[in-house]
Amino acid sequence: MKKKFILSACVIFIIAIIVIFYRMRYDISNTYVVYEKEDYYYEVIIKQYDGKVIISEEYHCLEPIVQEIDKDMLTVTVGRGDYWVTRFINVRDGVVSEGFGNMVAYSHDKVVYPAYKDGDMKIIVQDIFDENKYYYEIIRDYAPVAVGKYMIIDAKFLDDTTLYLKYYRGEEWEEVEEIIDL
């Protein structure tokens, strides 16, 4: 009886150690670090769970903001004033997105941001890592602004295929709300 108890305790202890090690190994907070150096220099290092470096970058006078947004996903945002650029990093797969200027919303696979393209102000909805998978332009009579983020009041995904968008329209800056099927 005593042997069975000791054996059971050992098995439980080993399982607990394995679970703790597994959780630590796959804990996203162990995949990144931001160092503050001298003279307003900052260094960001982001690694995959296996330790392989995905990003190692320095910034001067811009403190990068690293956020854990999902089990395997981080964002790195850098900017000041009216313009901020956000990149998404999948630490499991080692994939890094392009930089999105003044991002206003995101889901698990899409991002929403304003952009001035082809002579028009647009709101772009696209796949985070590959615009060839999904890309959608929302073109309206937006309020005239120099910086696109000021025309957007609110944006959020209601589900995988529906976007709520509130923005300013026209010279009078009329508030408009839309539900957009993507």
What are these regions (language model features)?
Residues 29-36, 70-81, 108-117, 161-168:
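Short beta-strand elements that form the blades of beta-propeller/WD-repeat-like
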Residues 41-57, 80-99, 122-145, 171-182:
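Surface-exposed loop/turn elements that mediate protein-protein interactions on large endomembrane-trafficking
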Residues 1-14, 18-20:
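N-terminal Sec-pathway targeting helices
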Residues 19-79:
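Terminal domain-start segments
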Residues 150-156, 160-182:
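Long, ordered, amphipathic alpha-helical scaffolds
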Residues 5-9, 84, 158:
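Generic structural microfeature
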Residues 60-67, 98-110, 144-155:
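Repeated scaffold domains used in trafficking and secretory/extracellular systems
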